[in-house]
Amino acid sequence: MTKIFRKSDPFIKIVNSALVDLPSPSNISYMWNFGSILGLCLFLQIATGLILTMHFSPSIHMAFSSVVHIVRDVNHGWFIRNFHITGASLFFSCMFIHIGRGIYYGSYKNIKTWYSGVILFICAMVTAFFGYVLPWGQMSFWAATVITNLLSAVPMMGTRMVETVWGGFSVGDPTLKRFLVLHFLVPFLMIAVSLTHLLFLHETGSSNPMGMNPNLDKVPFHPYFSFKDILGFLITLSLIFLGSTLFPYLTTDPDNFTQANSLVTPPHIKPEWYFLFAYAILRAIPNKLMGVFALIMSLSVLLFMPFLIKSNLRSLTFQPFMQFTFWLMISNFILLSWLGAMPLEFPYTIMSQVTSFLYFFIFLFLFPLVSYKENKYLNSRYPPF
């Protein structure tokens, strides 16, 4: 009997087991689409980034002019750049939703999958920061100066680290060249981490909205969920096209349309919107070293979730108090992002400190406490067999 080609060929067999015959829980919803959408966004960002790199000059004297050249003179250059900018915003929007879905439905219980995902998130944040500096606008220059200068908070070797990153005694030509190289290379590292993420995911299997054993009822990924993914791709592409053509500079800062000038400081230095929650936490603490520590912890706190939340139920679907805590965390995250865009003055300073405290309080104390109390209540009402 002749074997099916997709099951017999050594290479195609790997693709088949990951995309065609993959056993998937029958009840997963569209919230499970965002992983594949993130893969599409990463591919589009690399493709458009490669084209932009061909026309970009990594020199402090030419960088801003080369961006103007791309927009004005390169065939469809304005669209490719706008596509790259809008794609980055949508990439982070999908990533935040993907992480939120993972918290809500208990995906952090698959520790290897969760950790590789957090590493991907941190890599994406670092890559976006490098890319923000490249146009060498006013906000790019000052954001690079402020953020890289945070390394000076490291005891003993902080100043040496800052000068190594800068390639001199201030942000300049060597800094720009290094950031271009890193902005170019890290996405390829993200591809490798993404494959590892998929490998760990397929080892344990996907979670499901009910939080039940997913092995009870599974169906092949194709055609049941592949077509749902295609719909997600079409919506994503539509949003990127609409954003690139109708609202291309919706998320960009007006100061970045002015060439970098080290003698003029912008009245309010702020990063892109997807950094604002961490930036608000950084600014909320007057001490520099503690501010940097809080900034790192704002991302690293996700690594502690598998050990902090010990719910008997995997999903929050049947945990009303955990649901309330989750949406409190989401509301606090949105408020932090808004405060990060505000000037550092009263009352925003006090609000930033309160919301920063709440951010860590929810993750480190409220989630574990509520999950413990709900476990205790469930065990008292419905004792295990």
Swiss-Prot record:
It comes from Myxine glutinosa (Atlantic hagfish). It holds the Pfam family Cytochrome_B. Keywords: Electron transport, Heme, Iron, Membrane, Metal-binding, Mitochondrion, Mitochondrion inner membrane, Respiratory chain, Transmembrane, Transmembrane helix, Transport, Ubiquinone. InterPro entries: Cyt_b/b6_C, Cyt_b/b6_C_sf, Cyt_b/b6_N, Cytb/b6-like_sf, Cytochrome_b, Cytochrome_b_C_euk/bac, Cytochrome_b_N_euk/bac, Di-haem_cyt_TM. The keyword Phosphoprotein does not apply. Belongs to the cytochrome b family. A ubiquinone binds at residue 202. It is found in: Mitochondrion inner membrane. Heme b b562 binds at residues 84, 183. Its cofactor is heme b. Heme b b566 binds at residues 98, 197. This is Cytochrome b. Binds 2 heme b groups non-covalently. GO terms for cellular component: mitochondrial inner membrane; respiratory chain complex III. It comes from the Eukaryota. It is a multi-pass membrane protein. The chain crosses the membrane at residues 34-54, 78-99, 114-134, 179-199, 227-247, 289-309, 321-341, 348-368. One of its GO terms (molecular function) is ubiquinol-cytochrome-c reductase activity. Component of the ubiquinol-cytochrome c reductase complex (complex III or cytochrome b-c1 complex) that is part of the mitochondrial respiratory chain. The b-c1 complex mediates electron transfer from ubiquinol to cytochrome c. Contributes to the generation of a proton gradient across the mitochondrial membrane that is then used for ATP synthesis. Heme 1 (or BL or b562) is low-potential and absorbs at about 562 nm, and heme 2 (or BH or b566) is high-potential and absorbs at about 566 nm. GO terms for biological process: mitochondrial electron transport, ubiquinol to cytochrome c. Its main location: mitochondrion. The cytochrome bc1 complex contains 3 respiratory subunits (MT-CYB, CYC1 and UQCRFS1), 2 core proteins (UQCRC1 and UQCRC2) and probably 6 low-molecular weight proteins.
